[in-house]
């Protein structure tokens, strides 16, 4: 974790204990951080699992194995290594992951494919098997820790621990969620975009859990960007221990299914926002809302073209109401747009309507809005009913400083 805390940081929430999910931490020593860097979460037998993963074709062995093993639907453990991504490391990297899976599986007397592993850090450095083995051994013997301690342990360039919670009533039974996430740089929307872990005590069929997570992901994690770079290790996993005692949710027709899906979506959205708020060097949180598109998917792609534009992001960093850069980003998005119907605004003040600047446009309220930390950009394409909101942060000198020195 970085010593310099983001000005957009949020306090860590009070996360509930989740029956059947117990976190532990240990120090493997992947980097000379002087802190714990390995997280182990023990899961009750029968825990359902769902996941979404990066589509970066240079993904890590952790992602490859996780993507394959999530299909069997159940999990007994999660292990997260911080300080070494183990991506692009060939057979040695895969052997290191399989060794962790085998070690934990032997401890729990479960199949290795029910042990999920994630790693984060520098690409191209094999995970040291001896350090991993010792770290896992220490974690297996460690006393349980808090969710906040686990959240701190999975971080790399993160400046604050990130967590979210929610609850839902299912046929009179309260089910709870506790979630942690890490992410600060190399964040772009492509399935996941960081390492996120969601735990609930609800009883949920694995296929239904996957459907809910995939839907929530599309509307939350896939709508954020910090720097347009999609990591080789991106993973979001959801675990449902089934300990709450509710009637199992098997489809959207199950009583309480809508409430469960809504709570899961709320957790994912909160986590996604926290990642943006911890964007490397970020000073401002930006919400880009696009309306009037030919479809919601088209609106999302236009929004991301704006959110990924270095010129837009640096203008926001400089508190410059240069709405022409938004026009540029819309035009390059490759989506249906009509120059003569396009409208652009900041903070609820329209600067241009129907393809031209407003004659009575007053930049003063926009300039005042841009001095704040919470920025909104509004775009109306004037073509249809499609809408979407995406979230990003500004681009500052701090981002360059962090990434120029990342390996040192």
Language model features with spans:
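A structural signal for small-residue-enriched, beta-sheet-centric alpha/beta enzyme cores
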Residues: 2-81, 85-98, 105-408
């Amino acid at each position: 974790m970085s010593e310099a805390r983001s000005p957009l940081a949020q306090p860590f929430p009070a996360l509930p204990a989740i029956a059947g999910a117990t976190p532990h931490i240990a120090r493997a020593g992947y980097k000379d951080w002087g802190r714990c860097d390995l997280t182990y979460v023990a899961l009750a037998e029968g825990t359902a699992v769902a996941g979404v993963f990066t589509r970066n074709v240079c993904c890590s062995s952790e992602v490859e194995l996780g993507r394959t093993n999530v299909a069997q639907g159940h999990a007994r453990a999660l292990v997260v290594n911080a300080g070494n991504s183990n991506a692009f490391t060939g057979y040695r990297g895969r052997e290191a992951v399989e060794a962790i899976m085998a070690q934990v599986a032997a401890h729990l007397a479960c199949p290795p494919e029910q042990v999920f592993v994630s790693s984060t850090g520098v690409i191209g450095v094999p995970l040291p098997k001896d350090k991993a083995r010792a770290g896992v051994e220490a974690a297996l013997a460690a006393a349980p820790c808090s969710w906040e301690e686990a959240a701190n342990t999975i971080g790399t360039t993160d400046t604050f621990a990130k967590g979210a919670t929610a609850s839902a009533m299912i046929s009179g039974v309260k089910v709870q969620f506790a979630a942690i996430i890490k992410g600060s740089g190399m964040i772009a929307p492509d399935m996941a975009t960081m390492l996120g872990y969601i735990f609930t005590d609800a009883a949920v069929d694995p296929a239904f859990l996957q459907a809910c997570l995939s839907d929530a992901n599309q509307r939350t994690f896939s709508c954020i960007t910090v720097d347009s770079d999609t990591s080789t290790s991106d993973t979001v996993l959801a675990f449902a221990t089934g300990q709450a005692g509710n009637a199992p949710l098997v489809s959207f027709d199950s009583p309480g299914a809508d409430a469960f899906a809504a709570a899961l979506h709320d957790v994912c959205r909160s986590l996604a926002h926290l990642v943006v708020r911890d964007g490397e060097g970020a000073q401002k949180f930006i919400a880009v809302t696009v309306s009037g598109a030919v479809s919601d998917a088209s609106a999302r792609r236009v929004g991301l073209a704006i959110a990924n534009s270095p010129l837009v992001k640096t203008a926001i960093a400089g508190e410059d109401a240069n709405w022409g850069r938004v026009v540029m980003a819309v035009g390059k998005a490759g989506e249906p747009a009509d120059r003569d119907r396009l409208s652009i605004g900041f903070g609820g003040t329209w600067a241009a309507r129907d393809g031209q600047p407003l004659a009575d446009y007053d930049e003063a309220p926009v300039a005042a809005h841009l001095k704040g930390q919470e920025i909104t950009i509004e775009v109306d394409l004037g073509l249809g009913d499609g809408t979407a909101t995406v979230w990003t942060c500004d681009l500052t000198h701090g981002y360059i400083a962090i990434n120029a020195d990342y390996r040192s």
